[in-house]
């Protein structure tokens, strides 16, 4: 196991144990080990499902962003900037309008379909209009997502569904309980499929001509990968609501240190995404204990700041990985070429 993966797993395990103990009700390891019925019930019904949902959310959104960035060959594409989240919310609204008593699985079906179609339209659009500036791609995605979000808000207001839709507009884990979160487990097999086809995703990321030269069906692999990313996103949005920036910043941070190969970075991206969401959730629960802040607020604040830093980094250094020389250049310490002095006193 790589050292980075082992460190991330250890940190996730430690923070995960702390997460099980934090909440409005007191739960301690001593009460759990002593067999206290109330503590065990709280652990199994609320705390453990919440922890599992957090881990699946962080890993899933990070991998969805990684897949989209690899396929589109643009480090600023993600479920947030690719209209995937907005499309999933639109699908949930359609399910609520036509089936007010729909189950979580029927809402998920509409969210899957809408997220896949919305993501396909976005990618089809940027393929038809190649943009020289990589920053323009997420801007187009954000505008497209805002159009879908505006239609969603209008329909929700028109049919008096604003209150019902609000649950999916702001991501939070406060309503995650045993029996209503299991849909998020779909993230696990979808990530496994992404790992299996990582080599083909890497090839497609090189471009249409490169893919054809290697005998890879560019269009099929592209839209299959986008469908996987959209389904991961839709399953998470259906359970916990909209959570922005994870799929954007986590793959970029991992790529800075590990490079751009999807298969070699997939595990660390999933682990770091899970750890990042877990830490943000813990912060949101501790700030105003016994109350909690929505995780979308914490991640939105941190994510927007990191996103700005990433824009400047990518514009300056491109897709290069971080190394010692790049760190020195980043902080203003240029590497100087040593001057050799000859025996006669001259320089060469």
Question: How should these model regions be labeled?
Answer:
Residues 1-348:
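Alpha-helical transmembrane segments in inner-membrane proteins
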């Amino acid at each position: 196991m790589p050292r980075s993966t082992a460190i991330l797993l250890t940190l996730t395990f430690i923070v995960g144990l702390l997460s099980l103990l934090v909440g409005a009700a007191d739960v301690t390891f001593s009460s759990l080990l002593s067999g206290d019925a109330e503590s065990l019930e709280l652990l199994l019904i609320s705390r453990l499902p919440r922890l599992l949902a957090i881990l699946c959310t962080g890993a899933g959104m990070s991998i969805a962003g990684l897949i989209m960035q690899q396929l589109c060959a643009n480090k600023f594409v993600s479920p947030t900037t690719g209209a995937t989240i907005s499309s999933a919310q639109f699908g949930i609204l359609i399910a609520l309008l036509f089936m007010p008593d729909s189950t979580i699985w029927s809402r998920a079906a509409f969210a899957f379909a809408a997220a896949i179609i919305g993501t396909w339209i976005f990618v089809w659009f940027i393929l038809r209009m190649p943009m020289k500036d990589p920053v323009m791609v997420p801007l187009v995605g954000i505008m497209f997502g805002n159009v879908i979000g505006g239609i969603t808000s209008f329909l929700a207001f028109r049919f008096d569904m604003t209150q019902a839709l609000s649950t999916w507009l702001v991501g939070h884990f406060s309503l995650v309980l045993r029996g209503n979160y299991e849909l998020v487990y779909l993230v696990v097999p979808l990530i496994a499929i992404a790992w299996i086809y990582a080599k083909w995703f890497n090839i497609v990321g090189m471009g249409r001509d490169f893919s054809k030269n290697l005998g890879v069906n560019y269009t099929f692999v592209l839209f299959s990968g986008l469908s996987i990313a959209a389904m991961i996103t839709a399953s998470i949005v259906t359970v916990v609501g909209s959570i922005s920036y994870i799929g954007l910043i986590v793959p970029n941070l991992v790529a800075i240190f590990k490079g751009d190969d999807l298969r070699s970075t997939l595990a660390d991206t999933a682990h770091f995404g899970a750890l990042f969401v877990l830490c943000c959730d813990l912060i949101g629960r501790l700030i105003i204990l016994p109350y909690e802040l929505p995780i979308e607020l914490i991640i939105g604040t941190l994510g927007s700041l990191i996103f700005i830093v990433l824009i400047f980094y990518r514009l300056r250094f491109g897709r290069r990985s971080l190394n010692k020389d790049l760190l020195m250049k980043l902080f203003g310490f240029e590497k100087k070429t040593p001057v050799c002095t000859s025996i006669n006193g001259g320089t060469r």
